[in-house]
């Protein structure tokens, strides 16, 4: 999956350098500080804000531009707090454009609610951040390489100071 993805997205040099995100190991929140791969990168508020900025994607300028976009599916994932969740009710389907835009749909079968998702990948760091179009204050983030695996860690920022860890589990 990784090799196909890296040849699809333009303007990247990822082919041999996948970056895996592992919250608690490669990305660590220590008090009000965020450390990535051993380097202090930001305060927790700044890190959440940078995810929000990455997720804030402008819609296509025209219908023609939207129709011309090329998309590659990243997969359909159960959203859970536990790998052993046998009956997840929340599902996320994601795709990526050649330009690194993330698009998709969230569906909660317990409430029959669906919401559009939009966001982007940082082509330098491979960080992926996306948000609900209808609730842009909720920001989700993971690593692009993680989205090519069977499960991917996910941080959900409910506000700059409130976040929770989730897991995206690939559905077959």
Located regions from the model:
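Contiguous, well-ordered beta-strand patches that form the walls/edges
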Residues: 108-147
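Tryptophan-anchored aromatic micro-motifs
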Residues: 60-88, 151-158, 162-171
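Hydrophobic residues embedded in beta-strands of well-ordered beta-sheets
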Residues: 33-34, 40-41, 101-102, 126-128, ...
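Short beta-strand segments that buttress and anchor functional surface loops
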Residues: 78-82, 103-108, 129-133, 154-158
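Short, solvent-exposed coil/turn segments at beta-strand boundaries
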Residues: 94-102, 124-125, 145-151, 172
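Low-complexity segments
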Residues: 1-60
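N-terminal glycine/threonine-rich, aromatic-flanked beta-hairpin/loop signature
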Residues: 87-120
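Acidic/polar residues at beta-strand termini and the immediately following turn/coil
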Residues: 3, 96-97, 108, 122, ...
């Amino acid at each position: 999956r990784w090799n196909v993805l890296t040849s699809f997205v333009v303007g990247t040099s990822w082919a041999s350098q996948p970056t895996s995100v592992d919250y608690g190991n490669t990305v660590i929140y220590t008090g009000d500080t965020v450390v990535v791969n051993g380097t202090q990168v930001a305060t927790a508020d700044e890190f959440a804000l940078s995810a929000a900025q990455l997720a804030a994607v402008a819609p296509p300028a025209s219908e023609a531009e939207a129709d011309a976009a090329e998309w590659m599916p990243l997969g359909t994932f159960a959203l859970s707090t536990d790998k052993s969740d046998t009956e997840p009710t929340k599902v996320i389907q994601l795709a990526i454009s050649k330009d690194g835009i993330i698009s998709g749909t969230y569906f909660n079968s317990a409430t029959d609610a669906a919401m559009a998702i939009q966001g982007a990948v940082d082509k330098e760091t491979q960080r992926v951040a996306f948000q609900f179009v209808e609730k842009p204050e909720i920001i989700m983030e993971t690593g692009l390489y993680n989205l090519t695996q069977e499960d991917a860690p996910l941080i959900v920022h409910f506000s700059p100071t409130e976040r929770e860890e989730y897991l995206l589990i690939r559905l077959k």
